[in-house]
């Protein structure tokens, strides 16, 4: 099986290195490609480099660094960089979960979505970490990811235009839960940077996902992660609110 790895934390991030090591040890891939952004693109969503020159640097015959977004990286990988399309795309392992509203911002999910857009099985993978220490433990992916990939690849009813969004909890995993996305109210952790010019100020958004204390009433993947479960959520492209659409059509 030919597997393409990408991410949104950048080519040199520890998460994608851990992912490659897991895939190698699992023995599920006969060929592994890595095509990932040059820089950290967290929060980039599905933005692409349109009408701009995008530099692609070859590291090896199967490893490339793209000076652009996660979506651009995979878009080019599938159309220009790889000699054959992959059988599977794995995006991650992201430094931090992508749960609830996170999926709208996530470059990790977006990279996987580029594969799903042309019906290639695509899985986004994220790992919760300790916000205080910043340390990330890869034990849960190392223990469970091979099993999850094999399970999903054997699901006959998986519509390949659907992204499978997998999140690993910080604590030792209690098991796996298939969950809906869930939702939260974004937090307001914004720092105003020092400036002597009041007419030209800058801000740093330091956090969007609320901490566990402030998301206690949340449901779906958010609740399951906080309870210590690995979550798997199928995500589709069509975001139409069909209930509202039906009501709008009744206005005719």
From Swiss-Prot:
InterPro entries: SurE, SurE-like_Pase/nucleotidase, SurE-like_sf
UniProt catalytic activity: a ribonucleoside 5'-phosphate + H2O = a ribonucleoside + phosphate
Cellular localization per UniProt: Cytoplasm
Keyword terms of this UniProt record: Cytoplasm, Hydrolase, Metal-binding, Nucleotide-binding
Keyword DNA repair: no
Domain of life: Bacteria
CC annotations in GO: cytoplasm
GO molecular function term, any single one: exopolyphosphatase activity
Cofactor binding annotation: Binds 1 divalent metal cation per subunit.
E.C. number: 3.1.3.5
Cofactor(s) the protein needs: a divalent metal cation
Keyword Nucleotide-binding applies: yes
Sites where the protein binds a divalent metal cation: 8-9, 42, 94
Function: Nucleotidase that shows phosphatase activity on nucleoside 5'-monophosphates.
Family: Belongs to the SurE nucleotidase family.
Entry-linked PANTHER family: 5'-NUCLEOTIDASE SURE, 5'_3'-NUCLEOTIDASE SURE
HAMAP family cross-referenced by the UniProt entry: SurE
Protein name stated in the entry: 5'-nucleotidase SurE
Gene of this entry: surE
